[in-house]
């Protein structure tokens, strides 16, 4: 569960390393789960890259430390909270995605993120 003020690692090559969630999009929602869209501010970035520190970005949550239950009864959780930075059309701004992503991303029709990911769990 990603609340406002939660720090997330960035799972792509846009230049941002860490972002802090400042808003969960979609109604009056308190927290975000895998596949949800958030607004974040870049807290740590690589120099000489397109995304700088203190930029406001839109991101899709791809991994959470909180255990999620799938309809078939299986439980899954990850070691970290991670997101992929996207543009307003929900296409990733980077050209690579690092680490595994959850299958729920495919179910929410973020097929471009799934195609860039090395592993879908």
Swiss-Prot record:
Gene coding for it: rpl14
Gene Ontology cellular component annotations, sorted alphabetically: chloroplast; mitochondrial large ribosomal subunit
One GO biological process term: translation
Family: Belongs to the universal ribosomal protein uL14 family.
GO MF entries: large ribosomal subunit rRNA binding; structural constituent of ribosome
Record's protein name: Large ribosomal subunit protein uL14c
Keywords carried by this UniProt record: Chloroplast, Plastid, Ribonucleoprotein, Ribosomal protein, RNA-binding, rRNA-binding
Signal peptide: none
InterPro entries membership: Ribosomal_uL14 (IPR000218), Ribosomal_uL14_bac-type (IPR005745), Ribosomal_uL14_CS (IPR019972), Ribosomal_uL14_sf (IPR036853)
Task performed by this protein: Binds to 23S rRNA.
Major site of localization recorded for this protein: plastid
Subunit structure: Part of the 50S ribosomal subunit.
Annotated compartments: Plastid, Chloroplast
